[in-house]
């Protein structure tokens, strides 16, 4: 199943994609959009263009596991995406994903403007990898 991983941000939203066999997650793009409706349109178009069957949306929980304003916003955008794209949305706890993304970028010595341009897509890839890991574990039961 092709799944898009989505790391929502105030201005930049990272998007990642996996192969049909759900083995490999890769950064796809970063969508720069400040307006919710246009963001949902752009993400829906990406889902259709890439033949996605599921959207894995990062859920920014607080470190104690509670949900604040950002998590509520993610849930609202997820509901809009589900309706606009006609695809199921699965929320993935994204605590620590940006830190992990920065770690990957440090390992590859990615710096400056290039780093800023890709960090959100790499964070989306981490979210998608978490989703894929959870799906594999559920199948193995």
Region roles according to the model:
Residues 1-4, 10-141:
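Phosphate- and other anionic-substrate recognition elements at nucleic-acid/protein interfaces
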């Amino acid at each position: 199943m092709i799944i898009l991983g989505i790391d929502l941000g105030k201005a930049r939203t990272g998007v990642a994609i996996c192969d049909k066999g759900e083995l490999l997650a890769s950064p796809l793009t970063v969508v720069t959009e400040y307006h919710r409706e246009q963001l949902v349109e752009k993400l829906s178009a990406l889902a259709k263009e890439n033949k996605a069957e599921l959207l894995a949306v990062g859920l920014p929980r607080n470190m104690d596991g509670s949900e604040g304003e950002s998590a509520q916003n993610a849930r609202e955008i997820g509901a809009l995406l589900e309706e606009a794209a006609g695809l199921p949305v699965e929320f993935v706890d994204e605590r620590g994903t940006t830190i992990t993304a920065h770690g990957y970028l440090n390992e590859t010595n990615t710096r400056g403007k290039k780093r800023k341009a890709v960090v959100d897509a790499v964070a989306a890839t981490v979210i998608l990898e978490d989703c894929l890991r959870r799906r594999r574990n559920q199948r193995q039961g």
